[in-house]
Amino acid sequence: MMKKIFFIFALSGILAACTVGGGVSAGGGSNGVGLGVGIGSGIRF
């Protein structure tokens, strides 16, 4: 169950990163930075 919640959270994060572009990952808190960096690099590649 936790995996499913995390998956949905990661998916919404990917959508947000796609929409905003990556400025959010750089300007977010420590939590957002960790997520944004991992998700952003995945999108760019």
Curated annotation (Swiss-Prot):
The keyword Membrane applies. The chain crosses the membrane at residues 5-25. Its main location: membrane. It is a single-pass membrane protein. Keywords: Membrane, Transmembrane, Transmembrane helix. GO terms for cellular component: membrane. It is found in: Membrane. This is Uncharacterized protein HI_1327. It comes from Haemophilus influenzae (strain ATCC 51907 / DSM 11121 / KW20 / Rd).
